[in-house]
């Protein structure tokens, strides 16, 4: 049984085997993704990923409730770019904590955050630990993008060695959802100045500039994005997430 949380009636929810049902909570964001991709890129991808996951699970015996996408996240690193909206870290923490508390109150035992914006990961990880301790439920944190998968890496244009935010992969996925939302003719490529330090330092707002100090807002080159590449990325990512959901089902 796979269903959408918001589409169930109270009586239907009462009949759900809540102790053995996974609630998948997609975490989106509302932030700039360069000149070419919409502010809601992460939220749009989160919704599409849920659709692809549902298709991949059609032949599986699994109880899964898809929670509505949380459309705003922790985007402090993008706050100086026009249109970006962010929670404060503790606001975001308390909002997610309260959702988990409500779900636990109703008897759900298996919760899974589907992180569709990297900036949400630290809070999701913290919530996972706290909720397990406070409510004796099993919270999991899943990453929405199989960006290290060799078949996904193979979609990136030859010579493009960096694709982090608002680049070819994310832009391609949005093109699957609604090609009219992508304005490739306005795209710019860019690599934030501190990429050499990326393994050691968290991304800060000041990192989203070029070496010359120009605000860039993306990491990568979106000009090679295509709908076909987006289909590959969404499909492979959904298949990888499904593997994790099966493990959670059997946990």
Regions found by a protein language model. Give the residues of each.
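Extended, histidine- and acidic-residue-enriched regions that form the cofactor-binding/catalytic faces
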Residues: 1-110, 118-251
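Short, surface-exposed ligand- or partner-binding patches at beta-edge/loop junctions that are enriched
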Residues: 114
């Amino acid at each position: 049984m796979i269903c959408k949380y918001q589409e169930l009636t109270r009586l239907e929810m009462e009949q759900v085997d809540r102790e053995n049902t996974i609630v998948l909570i997609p975490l989106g964001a509302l932030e700039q993704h360069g000149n070419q991709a919409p502010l809601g890129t992460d939220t749009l991808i989160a919704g599409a990923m849920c659709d692809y996951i549902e298709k991949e699970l059609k032949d599986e015996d699994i109880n899964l409730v898809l929670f509505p996408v949380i459309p705003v996240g922790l985007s402090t690193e993008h706050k100086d770019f026009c249109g970006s909206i962010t929670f404060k870290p503790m606001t975001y923490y308390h909002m997610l904590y309260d959702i988990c508390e409500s779900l636990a109150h109703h008897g759900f035992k298996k919760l899974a955050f589907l992180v569709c914006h990297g900036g949400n990961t630290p809070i999701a990880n913290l919530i996972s630990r706290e909720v397990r301790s406070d409510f004796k439920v099993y919270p999991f944190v899943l990453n929405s993008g199989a960006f290290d998968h060799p078949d996904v890496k193979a979609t990136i244009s030859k010579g493009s060695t960096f694709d982090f935010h608002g680049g070819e992969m994310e832009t391609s996925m949005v093109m699957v959802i609604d090609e009219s939302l992508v304005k490739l003719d306005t795209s710019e490529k860019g690599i934030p100045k501190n990429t050499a330090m990326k393994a050691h330092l968290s991304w800060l707002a000041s990192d989203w500039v070029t070496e010359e100090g120009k605000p860039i807002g993306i990491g990568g080159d979106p000009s090679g994005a295509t709908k076909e590449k987006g289909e590959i990325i969404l499909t492979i990512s959904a298949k990888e997430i499904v593997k994790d959901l099966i493990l959670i089902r059997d946990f």
